[in-house]
Amino acid sequence: MKFILYNLATAKEPWADEVSELYKKKISFFIPFDIQSLKAKKSAREDADFKRNEESELILKNINSDDYVVLFDERGSVLDSIQFSKKVENILGSSKKRAIFIIGGAFGVNEEVRKRADLKVALSPMVMNHLMAQAMSLEQIYRAFTIIKKIPYHNI
């Protein structure tokens, strides 16, 4: 199995790149892992629906029918780290070849992506930018593996 994180972030910050590389390396210790930035065409901020649909189509084009899809979405289930680790463990026990983790664009994703997601997880009831969402999702994926493997990291 391979885990892939798709994002639509357009902003670049040195700290976010460092965090992403750090957690990519840590997660790759447990499973083949990659972070892929999907690039949608630029459009005006006023075209929120157009941009959401265009980015959602791009996401769907990069998902195979047999992938397990996890969508990080503010409307998803609120899980604690133990609950999330159990979901990751179930994914690992499935017959899927890839697990795709998705962080939507600035305007979120459309209903088609939500329907395609096998699991929808809220990182927080608060809204955050993509760089923060990516940092939090990477840390939680890593934390899930340390819980599953009983590696001292999660201290609750």
Swiss-Prot record:
- Keyword annotations: Cytoplasm, Methyltransferase, rRNA processing, S-adenosyl-L-methionine, Transferase
Name where it's found: Cytoplasm
Per UniProt, subunit arrangement is: Homodimer.
- Residues binding S-adenosyl-L-methionine, per UniProt: G104, L123, S124, P125, M126, V127, M128
EC nos: 2.1.1.177
Say yes or no: keyword Methyltransferase present: yes
- Pfam families with a match to the protein in the record: SPOUT_MTase
Per its UniProt record, what InterPro entries does this chain match? Alpha/beta_knot_MTases (IPR029028), RlmH-like (IPR003742), tRNA_m1G_MTases_N (IPR029026)
One GO cellular component from the entry?
cytoplasm
The organism encoding this protein is Bdellovibrio bacteriovorus (strain ATCC 15356 / DSM 50701 / NCIMB 9529 / HD100)
Family per similarity comment: Belongs to the RNA methyltransferase RlmH family.
What protein name does the entry list? Ribosomal RNA large subunit methyltransferase H
